[in-house]
Amino acid sequence: MSAIVAHGITVTLDGTRVLDGVDLTVAEGEWLALLGPNGAGKTTLVRALSGTVKHGGTVTFGGAPSSDGARADGGPRGAGGPRERARRVAVVPQTPVIPPGITAFEYVLLGRTAHQGMRLSASLDDRRRSLAVLQRLDLERFAQRDLATLSGGERQRVVLARALVADAPLLVLDEPTAALDLGHQFEILELLAELQQERGLTVVTTLHDLGIAGQFGDRLAVLSEGRLVAHGAPAEVLTPEAIGRWWGVDATCTVDDEGRVDVTVRRRRVAGVEPAANPAATPATTSADDATPVSGR
């Protein structure tokens, strides 16, 4: 069964057509990675799917009927108002808004009450569920810490916890690892993969790193200039020819037994220019006696 069926999604912002008739289907329990160069429309498509930007076309969730067009508030017709969408779709924006002075627990609790209104309406069950998610993500020790004092990786786990506590079947993430180093990127994505399996979640995420997309996405979709130009399994989408066409780089793609794709991007040589010598490959010839002294400690 399809978790999302989007048909003819069109978005115009400030007179510019950002998305142009995008058709996209995401199966239940699938991880779809949205790819494309900067300005391709990835974030706008995520906003259209999650109902936070006005759009033309239709979006259907889990077989629920949807009408043409979009409401004035940006939400897809047939998906209900903001509270109903909060039950269906949990969103992790690229730059989450973090209220000053809020604790990690209070922030996660907002994920339970988004469809209810004010944070003060949280029930005892909401609080228990919020604490349980913090425990699952190994964040319990940070529950009463000011969210702004946590490291980037810890903060991103809390942001993910807020989305998970909503118990929505669809999780939409816009560049969830953009501000993290490589180690923390894989930590967050491995955790997300575990949670997807545990909960049977449908995951839609935008990514810039082709190698990461090839390792984690069940299916990939590529946008270019507001149009969907490819959609399929990683091995079908991530080929040297396709990467050269859409990103303008040379790449080698290796497919493993599970259909995951490892992407290696190669530096392009400029005709007539010799590459600079690699210092690491040149034997050292300077002795300690020849070294230039440095003032200081």
Name the predicted role of every residue range.
Residues 121, 146-150, 154:
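Conserved ABC ATPase signature
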Residues 171-175:
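Catalytic Walker B motif of ABC-type/P-loop ATPase nucleotide-binding domains
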Residues 246-297:
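ABC ATPase nucleotide-binding domains
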Residues 35-37:
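The feature captures the beta-strand-to-loop junction immediately N-terminal to the Walker
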